[in-house]
Every structure is written in structure tokens, then in C-alpha cells.
């Protein structure tokens, strides 16, 4: 499992931006496509909100990839 550290003073990152920053997708359009196709899970549940706020402690999963926000 990867760890993703939020920036100092940042409370959250949007789901589509996180999976793009982690390199799991190449573009924002692909991120939207993957979320719309119910391929992304947050804390074990399928997530369809593109702008879902990922906060410290949340675990995001895509295929065999997992990351925890710190």
C-alpha cells in the first residue's frame, strides 16, 4: 500500500486529482472515466463522486493499487 501525504494545511484532496497524482491514470479524463465506471473504491466502497473529498486515514483502491491518505 502506498501512502499519500496531504500538503501542510490541506484538509483533503479530490478523488480524481489523487488518482492522477498517484499515476494510476494518465489524464483527468481517464480519472473521470474510471470513477464513472465504478472502478474506484474508497474505504472499501465503490465511489462515484468525482470530487469526493479524500481526507487523512481514507484508503483508495483501484485494481491492485491501494493508497492511504496521511
Regions found by a protein language model. Name each.
Residues 13-53:
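A basic, amphipathic helix-loop patch mediating RNA/tRNA/ribosome contacts
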Residues 1-11:
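A detector for short, charged/polar N-terminal pre-domain segments
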Amino acid at each position: 500500500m502506498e501512502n499519500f501525504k496531504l500538503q501542510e494545511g490541506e484538509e483533503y484532496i479530490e478523488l480524481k486529482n489523487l488518482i492522477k497524482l498517484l499515476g494510476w491514470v494518465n489524464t483527468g479524463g481517464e480519472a473521470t472515466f474510471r470513477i464513472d465506471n465504478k472502478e474506484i473504491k474508497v474505504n472499501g466502497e465503490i465511489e462515484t463522486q468525482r470530487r469526493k473529498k479524500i481526507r487523512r486515514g481514507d484508503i483508495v483502491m483501484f485494481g491492485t493499487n491501494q493508497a492511504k491518505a496521511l
